[in-house]
Amino acid sequence: MIKRIMLALALLAALLTGCSSGPNYKIDMTKPLYFQKDKAMPFEIKVLENKKTVKGLKVTVEFSMANMDHGSHKAKLTEGKAGTYAGNIQLAMPGKYEAAFTLEKGGEKTEKIINLNVKKPQGIASINGKWITNDDLAFYRFINQLQLEINRESAKKQYRGKQLEEELTYLKSQEKMLDDKNQLLTQIIRLRSMAMLAEEKGHKVDPANVEQEIQKVRNQYSQYTSVKRLIKGYGEEKFWTKERKQYQSIVLIQQVQKDLIAQAKKDNPKAGDQEVYYEAQQKYEDLLVSQVNSLKIVIL
């Protein structure tokens, strides 16, 4: 509040003396700021002038609550790509804040204030505003654990002696990857991003196809004692409800993959299956990168 009053007085003084108010910068929040207790949280802005991004600025910010006095919180922002500036700041509580920015370039300083409502996050990341939660991460961890158990049981049936020992040692080393948050997030973002692309292309979820895929998974899992035991411990109804939701996205993605295979065959009718599938996979990865870049993804 004090910062806003001081800025108003400075602007009034400029008007009275006929001085220029300096560059006409506009600040847009490109990544929202959320509150987590005892943790500095990331945020990002874009600075514009006449609808063009402004590069080469030195940017600092001071946050203060709009309606209460809980002191101020300062941060220095680092320049990124295309006129973006990012930083981390630890706030005392959620609520309405005034963010007073100081933007400096060529020795000239400009001050701008924006108001924002800082809320508690509903998850650990979001894609176009749709949250990825810790529960989502836990489910993906469990799915990966099931796959490890399948590989372990399969190895015991397939190998003997030293070869079995080496395979089991390798699988044991993979267990630490189960808790890799970045890998789990990447899996979720890849799946959900491409499912969103499928919907954008007009594809729909066919419940019959989903149930068909679920039955295939049930048949596979039923062959492994350790997998059945883990699912029972997780809660069978809970597991299959989540798995069914997962396969709604997978069925959508399969339609995109079929489109790409059909296009690859059309582009090169003399190509063999291996070449067609390779070309389709390359196109899929290109589409994935393009889709992810087009989405507003926030990772906390």
What are these regions (language model features)?
Residues 79-86:
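Aromatic sugar-binding surface patches on proteins
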Residues 79, 91-93:
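Residue-level recognition of secondary-structure-to-loop junctions
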Residues 49-63, 68-74:
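Short flexible loop/turn segments that cap and initiate beta-strands
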Residues 33, 37-53:
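Beta-strand-rich structural segments
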Residues 15-18:
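C-terminal motif of bacterial Sec signal peptides marking the signal peptidase cleavage site
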